Amino acid sequence: MTNDKEKRLKELNRMQYEVTQNNGTEPPFQNEFWDHKEEGIYVDIISGKPLFSSLDKFDAHCGWPSFTKPLEDEEVAEKVDKSHGMVRTEVRSKTADSHLGHVFPDGPGPNGLRYCINSAALKFIPKDDLEKEGYGDLKHLFD
Protein backbone atom coordinates (compact mmCIF):
# COMPACT_ATOMS: atom_id res chain seq x y z
CA MET A 1 0.00 0.00 0.00
CA THR A 2 2.86 2.41 0.72
CA ASN A 3 3.96 3.08 -2.89
CA ASP A 4 0.36 3.13 -4.08
CA LYS A 5 -0.61 5.45 -1.21
CA GLU A 6 2.29 7.81 -1.98
CA LYS A 7 1.20 7.93 -5.63
CA ARG A 8 -2.41 8.67 -4.70
CA LEU A 9 -1.40 11.34 -2.19
CA LYS A 10 0.43 13.19 -4.97
CA GLU A 11 -2.77 13.14 -7.06
CA LEU A 12 -4.90 14.82 -4.38
CA ASN A 13 -5.90 18.45 -4.71
CA ARG A 14 -5.16 20.88 -1.88
CA MET A 15 -8.50 20.37 -0.07
CA GLN A 16 -8.37 16.58 -0.38
CA TYR A 17 -4.88 16.56 1.10
CA GLU A 18 -5.77 18.98 3.91
CA VAL A 19 -8.84 16.96 4.92
CA THR A 20 -7.39 13.46 4.68
CA GLN A 21 -3.84 14.07 5.90
CA ASN A 22 -4.16 17.06 8.25
CA ASN A 23 -7.59 16.28 9.76
CA GLY A 24 -9.08 19.31 8.03
CA THR A 25 -12.72 20.12 7.40
CA GLU A 26 -14.09 21.44 4.12
CA PRO A 27 -16.67 24.25 4.11
CA PRO A 28 -20.29 23.19 4.63
CA PHE A 29 -22.63 23.46 1.63
CA GLN A 30 -19.58 24.08 -0.61
CA ASN A 31 -18.46 20.54 -1.26
CA GLU A 32 -19.14 17.96 -3.94
CA PHE A 33 -21.48 15.51 -2.22
CA TRP A 34 -23.45 17.42 0.44
CA ASP A 35 -26.64 17.28 -1.66
CA HIS A 36 -25.66 14.49 -4.05
CA LYS A 37 -28.56 12.12 -4.69
CA GLU A 38 -27.34 9.62 -7.32
CA GLU A 39 -27.35 5.92 -6.38
CA GLY A 40 -23.96 4.33 -5.85
CA ILE A 41 -21.17 3.94 -3.34
CA TYR A 42 -18.64 6.31 -1.82
CA VAL A 43 -15.10 4.97 -1.60
CA ASP A 44 -11.97 6.16 0.18
CA ILE A 45 -10.24 8.63 -2.15
CA ILE A 46 -6.85 7.18 -1.19
CA SER A 47 -7.30 3.42 -0.76
CA GLY A 48 -10.38 2.94 -2.95
CA LYS A 49 -12.03 0.85 -0.23
CA PRO A 50 -15.85 1.03 -0.15
CA LEU A 51 -16.97 3.16 2.79
CA PHE A 52 -20.59 4.32 2.41
CA SER A 53 -23.66 3.73 0.24
CA SER A 54 -26.15 6.21 -1.16
CA LEU A 55 -28.82 3.92 0.35
CA ASP A 56 -27.65 5.03 3.82
CA LYS A 57 -27.23 8.72 2.92
CA PHE A 58 -29.64 11.31 4.30
CA ASP A 59 -30.00 15.08 4.44
CA ALA A 60 -28.86 16.14 7.90
CA HIS A 61 -29.06 19.85 6.96
CA CYS A 62 -25.45 20.26 8.10
CA GLY A 63 -23.78 20.89 4.72
CA TRP A 64 -21.77 17.67 4.53
CA PRO A 65 -22.71 14.23 3.24
CA SER A 66 -24.25 12.26 6.10
CA PHE A 67 -24.80 8.53 6.41
CA THR A 68 -26.51 6.30 8.98
CA LYS A 69 -23.76 3.66 8.80
CA PRO A 70 -20.66 2.59 6.93
CA LEU A 71 -20.89 -0.12 4.30
CA GLU A 72 -18.48 -2.30 6.27
CA ASP A 73 -17.58 -1.54 9.88
CA GLU A 74 -14.12 -3.02 9.43
CA GLU A 75 -13.18 -0.29 6.91
CA VAL A 76 -13.65 2.60 9.34
CA ALA A 77 -11.99 3.35 12.65
CA GLU A 78 -13.31 5.63 15.37
CA LYS A 79 -11.04 7.73 17.56
CA VAL A 80 -11.64 10.32 20.29
CA ASP A 81 -11.01 13.83 18.95
CA LYS A 82 -10.50 16.61 21.52
CA SER A 83 -9.57 19.34 19.03
CA HIS A 84 -11.23 22.76 18.79
CA GLY A 85 -12.35 22.67 22.43
CA MET A 86 -14.80 19.81 21.79
CA VAL A 87 -14.92 16.09 22.43
CA ARG A 88 -16.05 14.28 19.29
CA THR A 89 -15.59 10.91 17.66
CA GLU A 90 -13.39 11.09 14.58
CA VAL A 91 -13.96 8.65 11.71
CA ARG A 92 -10.86 7.44 9.86
CA SER A 93 -10.23 5.08 7.00
CA LYS A 94 -8.61 1.96 8.43
CA THR A 95 -6.70 1.05 5.28
CA ALA A 96 -5.34 4.50 4.36
CA ASP A 97 -5.41 5.90 7.93
CA SER A 98 -6.91 9.10 6.56
CA HIS A 99 -9.37 11.49 8.20
CA LEU A 100 -12.92 11.12 6.88
CA GLY A 101 -15.04 13.17 9.29
CA HIS A 102 -16.93 12.56 12.55
CA VAL A 103 -19.78 10.42 13.85
CA PHE A 104 -22.49 11.89 16.08
CA PRO A 105 -25.27 10.23 18.12
CA ASP A 106 -28.04 12.34 16.54
CA GLY A 107 -28.91 10.46 13.36
CA PRO A 108 -32.00 8.65 12.16
CA GLY A 109 -32.20 4.91 11.73
CA PRO A 110 -31.84 2.03 14.14
CA ASN A 111 -28.41 3.01 15.46
CA GLY A 112 -29.18 6.73 15.86
CA LEU A 113 -25.84 7.65 14.29
CA ARG A 114 -24.86 10.37 11.82
CA TYR A 115 -21.61 9.84 9.99
CA CYS A 116 -20.75 13.38 8.88
CA ILE A 117 -18.10 12.90 6.20
CA ASN A 118 -16.01 15.32 4.16
CA SER A 119 -16.66 15.03 0.41
CA ALA A 120 -12.94 15.63 -0.14
CA ALA A 121 -12.21 12.23 1.46
CA LEU A 122 -14.54 10.39 -0.91
CA LYS A 123 -14.83 9.28 -4.51
CA PHE A 124 -18.30 8.42 -5.82
CA ILE A 125 -18.91 5.31 -7.93
CA PRO A 126 -22.35 5.36 -9.64
CA LYS A 127 -24.32 2.12 -9.35
CA ASP A 128 -24.17 1.63 -13.14
CA ASP A 129 -20.34 1.80 -13.05
CA LEU A 130 -19.76 -0.58 -10.12
CA GLU A 131 -18.78 -3.51 -12.35
CA LYS A 132 -16.38 -1.58 -14.58
CA GLU A 133 -14.77 0.19 -11.60
CA GLY A 134 -14.07 -3.12 -9.82
CA TYR A 135 -16.92 -3.04 -7.30
CA GLY A 136 -19.23 -5.54 -9.01
CA ASP A 137 -19.59 -7.51 -5.78
CA LEU A 138 -21.63 -4.58 -4.40
CA LYS A 139 -24.18 -4.39 -7.25
CA HIS A 140 -26.57 -6.53 -5.21
CA LEU A 141 -27.09 -3.58 -2.86
CA PHE A 142 -29.11 -1.82 -5.54
CA ASP A 143 -31.24 -4.76 -6.78
From Swiss-Prot:
It catalyses: L-methionyl-[protein] + [thioredoxin]-disulfide + H2O = L-methionyl-(R)-S-oxide-[protein] + [thioredoxin]-dithiol. GO terms for molecular function: peptide-methionine (R)-S-oxide reductase activity. Its EC number is 1.8.4.12. GO terms for biological process: protein repair; response to oxidative stress. Keywords: Oxidoreductase. One of its GO terms (cellular component) is cytoplasm. InterPro entries: Met_Sox_Rdtase_MsrB, Met_Sox_Rdtase_MsrB_dom, Mss4-like_sf. The active site is at residue 116. Gene3D superfamilies: Peptide methionine sulfoxide reductase. The keyword RNA-binding does not apply. It holds the Pfam family SelR. Residues 5-127 form the MsrB domain. Belongs to the MsrB Met sulfoxide reductase family. HAMAP family: MsrB (MF_01400). This is Peptide methionine sulfoxide reductase MsrB. It comes from Bacillus pumilus (strain SAFR-032). The gene is msrB.
